[in-house]
C-alpha cells in the first residue's frame, strides 16, 4: 500500500459516506443556481456576460463585497471541513496504526490524504462550474474563456490550499477537539479578523516608534503598503485579488476591494508600476505556499510524534 492507495481509499470513503455527493450537490446548487438566477432572471439579454457575476465586485468604502470573495469564504469552510479530521480521527480510532502496518510510511499517509481529500473538493468544485457552464449555454451568456478558465483553476488551487491547512492541523493535533478548535479559530481569523490584524500591525509599529527614541514612525505610504501586503498573506484575499486580475487587470484588481485610504495612497503608485510584492506572480506564489507549507509543517510534527 502506497500514497496512491491511501488516496484512492480516501476518495472511496468519501463516496461511501456521501460527503462527495453532498459537497457536489452544494456547489452545483450554489454556483449553477447563482448563474441561472443571475443570467436567467435578473439581467437582460444584452448584459449577459459571465464576468458580470464571476467578476462581480462592489466596494462600499468601509467594506467590499464580491462573488469570488463569497465563493472563497464558502470554499474555505468546506475545504477545512473535508480535511481537519483526516488523520486525527483515524489516530483516535486506532485505524491509523493498522494503516501504518500495511506497510505505509507516515509520508504515504499524509500525501495520500492530501491527494484524496483534494480530489473530493476539486470534483465538487468542477461539477459546480460545469453547472455554471450549462447555465451560460441555456441563457445565452457570453463567456471569455481566457478569464473564466483561469478563474476555475484558481478556485481549485484555493480549495487544495484549505485542504492542506486542515490536513496540517489534523496531522499536528493531539486530539479531535484540539483540531476542531484550531480549525474554527483559524477560519474565524481568515474570514473576519485578518484585515483588522493586518491594518493594526503597522499602527502598532508606529506606536512603538513614537515611544522609542531615535526611531522614526512609518510614512503613511509605507504603512499602507505593509498593511495591504499583510492582507495578501491571507489565502482568501490572495485568491480574491487574483480572480479580480483575470477580469480587470493587475492595477484595478489591487484596488477593487481596497479600503478608501488604500485606494488614495496606492492608486498613483500602481499607475507608475506594480511593486514586485504586489504582482500577480508573487501573489500566486503566496497561494501555492498555502498548498505546500501547512501540510509540510503538519507532517513534520506528525513524523516526530509517538503514536
What name fits each language-model region?
Residues 105-117:
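Membrane-interface alpha-helices at helix entry/exit sites of multi-pass transporters
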Residues 79-83, 131, 165, 194, ...:
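Hydrophobic/aromatic residues in alpha-helical transmembrane segments
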Residues 15-22, 67, 153-212:
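A structural motif at transmembrane helix-loop-helix junctions in multipass membrane proteins
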Residues 34-36, 40, 53-69, 116-174, ...:
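Secretory targeting signals
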Residues 62-89:
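Long, hydrophobic alpha-helical segments
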Residues 41-43, 192-292, 296:
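Terminal transmembrane helical anchor/hairpin motif
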Residues 80-102, 114:
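Transmembrane helix boundary and interhelical loop/hinge segments in multi-pass membrane proteins
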Residues 1-31:
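Aromatic- and glycine-rich beta-strand/loop motifs that create alpha-glucan
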Amino acid at each position: 500500500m502506497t500514497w496512491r492507495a491511501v488516496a484512492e481509499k480516501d476518495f472511496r470513503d468519501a463516496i461511501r459516506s456521501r460527503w462527495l455527493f453532498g459537497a457536489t450537490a452544494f456547489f452545483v446548487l450554489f454556483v449553477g443556481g447563482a448563474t441561472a438566477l443571475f443570467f436567467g432572471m435578473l439581467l437582460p439579454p444584452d448584459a449577459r456576460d459571465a464576468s458580470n457575476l464571476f467578476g462581480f465586485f462592489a466596494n462600499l468604502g468601509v467594506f467590499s463585497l464580491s462573488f469570488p470573495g463569497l465563493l472563497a469564504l464558502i470554499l474555505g469552510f468546506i475545504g477545512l471541513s473535508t480535511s481537519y479530521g483526516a488523520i486525527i480521527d483515524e489516530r483516535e480510532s486506532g485505524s491509523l496504526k493498522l494503516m501504518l502496518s500495511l506497510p505505509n510510511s507516515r509520508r504515504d499517509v499524509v500525501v495520500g490524504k492530501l491527494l484524496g481529500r483534494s480530489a473530493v473538493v476539486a470534483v465538487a468544485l468542477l461539477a459546480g462550474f460545469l453547472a455554471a457552464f450549462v447555465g451560460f449555454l441555456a441563457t445565452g451568456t457570453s463567456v471569455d474563456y481566457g478569464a473564466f478558465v483561469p478563474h476555475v483553476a484558481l478556485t481549485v488551487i484555493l480549495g487544495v490550499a484549505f485542504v492542506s491547512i486542515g490536513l496540517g492541523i489534523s496531522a499536528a493535533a493531539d486530539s479531535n477537539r484540539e483540531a476542531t478548535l484550531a480549525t474554527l479559530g483559524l477560519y474565524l481569523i481568515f474570514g473576519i479578523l485578518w484585515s483588522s490584524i493586518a491594518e493594526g500591525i503597522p499602527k502598532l509599529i508606529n506606536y512603538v516608534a513614537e515611544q522609542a527614541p531615535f526611531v522614526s514612525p512609518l510614512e503613511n505610504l509605507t504603512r499602507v503598503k505593509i498593511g495591504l501586503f499583510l492582507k495578501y498573506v491571507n489565502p482568501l484575499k490572495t485568491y480574491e485579488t487574483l480572480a479580480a486580475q483575470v477580469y480587470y487587470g493587475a492595477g484595478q484588481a489591487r484596488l477593487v476591494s481596497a479600503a478608501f485610504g488604500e485606494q488614495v495612497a496606492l492608486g498613483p503608485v500602481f499607475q507608475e508600476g506594480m511593486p514586485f510584492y504586489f504582482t500577480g506572480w508573487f501573489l500566486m506564489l503566496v497561494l501555492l505556499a498555502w498548498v505546500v507549507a501547512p501540510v509540510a509543517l503538519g507532517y513534520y510534527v506528525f513524523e516526530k510524534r509517538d503514536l
